[in-house]
């Protein structure tokens, strides 16, 4: 996909770097596979802000994505590729031989007219969804389940992928892009290939308004606030004179907050392991 740098016709266009894809569908999404998406502006049921920096943005329709890929043995054809405002990856509309249509995360390299299959007997090619027991060791995969039948949870964003590095007994070991090595049950499904739109990380929005269109509100530095609003607030000049903390007083910048979980035993190697 071409990466386009715009001419500086205005201050807001000067730094914009866009990623274009001429093969994407220009029209509306399939109505039967869309749902209403209600925004909450980062507020909970009491109206209090629970997630900062959210609010506004363009109205969006949610595209219902098939993360389970359960139509085994029924061949499908890629009818079109589409933009999805709810994720960084592109999506593909599949038309199955029985007439049903479903959206999936579009794998890199898949184009309109390509055949897509799922199930234990699916061919080993990009876009096929199989249990990990049927995927050759060394293969690059995405949209990986963590529990059999729950649906894909790992490696779903633009350009994401993982590699099957081993298979022993009931578990397969996958290496994530972060460097983490993780065990997953061999009954869990994964899709061959990597996720489309890998150039997404090259995109430069160019102005604050482009983030506001996406529902992202400004982030104010704690040192620019008053003492009543943040532990870093107040004082003369720019120094806040203490160890950096969050707005709620928890140490930050290196302080570990992750609690141990039952599933830690599935992590073979941490992403930050030396």
Curated annotation (Swiss-Prot):
Domain of life: Bacteria
Entry keyword RNA-binding: yes
GO molecular function per UniProt: rRNA binding; structural constituent of ribosome; transferase activity
Gene Ontology biological process terms from the UniProt entry: cytoplasmic translation
Gene Ontology cellular-component annotations: large ribosomal subunit
Sequence segments annotated as region (Disordered): 221-256
UniProt keywords, alphabetically: Ribonucleoprotein, Ribosomal protein, RNA-binding, rRNA-binding
Pfam family name, one: Ribosomal_L2_C
Entry's transmembrane regions: none
InterPro entries: NA-bd_OB-fold, Rib_uL2_dom2, Ribosomal_uL2, Ribosomal_uL2_bac/org-type, Ribosomal_uL2_C, Ribosomal_uL2_CS, Ribosomal_uL2_dom3, Ribosomal_uL2_RNA-bd_dom
Protein family (similarity comment): Belongs to the universal ribosomal protein uL2 family.
Assembly description: Part of the 50S ribosomal subunit. Forms a bridge to the 30S subunit in the 70S ribosome.
Described function: One of the primary rRNA binding proteins. Required for association of the 30S and 50S subunits to form the 70S ribosome, for tRNA binding and peptide bond formation. It has been suggested to have peptidyltransferase activity; this is somewhat controversial. Makes several contacts with the 16S rRNA in the 70S ribosome.
Protein name according to UniProt: Large ribosomal subunit protein uL2
Protein encoded by which gene: rplB
């Amino acid at each position: 996909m071409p990466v386009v740098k715009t001419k500086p016709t205005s201050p807001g266009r000067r730094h914009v770097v866009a990623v274009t894809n001429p093969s994407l569908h220009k029209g509306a999404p399939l109505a039967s596979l869309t749902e209403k998406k209600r925004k909450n502006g980062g507020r909970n049921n009491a109206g209090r802000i629970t997630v900062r920096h959210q609010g506004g943005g363009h109205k969006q329709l949610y595209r219902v994505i098939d993360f389970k890929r359960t139509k085994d043995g029924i061949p499908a054809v890629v009818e079109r590729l589409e933009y999805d405002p709810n994720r960084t990856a592109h999506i593909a509309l599949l038309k199955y031989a029985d007439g049903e249509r479903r959206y999936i995360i579009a794998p890199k390299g898949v184009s309109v007219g390509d055949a897509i299959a799922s199930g234990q007997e699916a061919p080993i090619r990009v876009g096929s969804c199989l249990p990990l027991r049927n995927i050759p060791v060394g293969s690059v995969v995405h949209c990986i389940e963590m529990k059999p039948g729950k649906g894909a949870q790992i490696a779903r964003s633009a350009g994401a992928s993982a590699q099957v590095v081993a298979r022993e007994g009931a578990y397969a070991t996958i290496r994530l892009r972060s460097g983490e090595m993780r065990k997953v049950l061999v009954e869990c499904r994964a899709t061959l290939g990597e996720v489309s739109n890998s150039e997404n990380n090259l995109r430069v929005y160019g102005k604050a308004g482009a983030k506001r269109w996406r529902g992202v509100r400004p982030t104010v530095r704690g040192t620019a606030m008053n003492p009543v609003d943040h532990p870093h607030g107040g004082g003369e000049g720019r120094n806040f004179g203490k160890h950096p903390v969050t707005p709620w007083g928890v140490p930050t910048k290196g302080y570990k907050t992750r609690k141990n979980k039952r599933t830690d035993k599935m992590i073979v190697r941490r992403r930050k392991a030396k």
